[in-house]
From Swiss-Prot:
Involved in the binding of tRNA to the ribosomes. It comes from Clostridium acetobutylicum (strain ATCC 824 / DSM 792 / JCM 1419 / IAM 19013 / LMG 5710 / NBRC 13948 / NRRL B-527 / VKM B-1787 / 2291 / W). It comes from the Bacteria. This is Small ribosomal subunit protein uS10. InterPro entries: Ribosomal_uS10, Ribosomal_uS10_CS, Ribosomal_uS10_dom, Ribosomal_uS10_dom_sf.
């Protein structure tokens, strides 16, 4: 697996869980001897939904809700088979979405 790079992209609604997960991944990769670049914070997506407060009329009275999607990027440079095995066994919280590209 020489000259390879693993790119891990994390997404979550809660930034604290996201940062903890990123720290676990970085710690695991460093203990197995791989070089790590990151975690790099990517731009936060903000999704805003506007709805009417009233079910029938009063168009001027509206309410807005938003949900923010926080993202982080981690590059693992020249990973060993031991690194890949350790990352596969890593237990992360349920609220974190992980995309791995080799």
């Amino acid at each position: 697996m020489a000259k390879q790079k693993i790119r891990i992209r994390l997404k979550a609604f809660d930034h604290t869980i996201l940062d903890q997960s990123a720290e676990k991944i970085v710690e695991t990769a460093k203990t197995t001897g791989a070089k790590v670049a990151g975690p790099v914070p990517l731009p936060t997506e903000k999704d805003v939904v506007t709805i009417l407060r009233s079910p029938h009329k009063y168009k001027d009275s509206r309410e807005q809700f938003e949900i923010r999607t926080h993202k982080r990027l981690i590059d693992i440079i020249s990973p060993s088979p031991k690194t890949v095995d350790a990352l596969m066994r890593l237990d992360l919280p349920a609220g974190v979405d992980i995309e791995i590209k080799l």
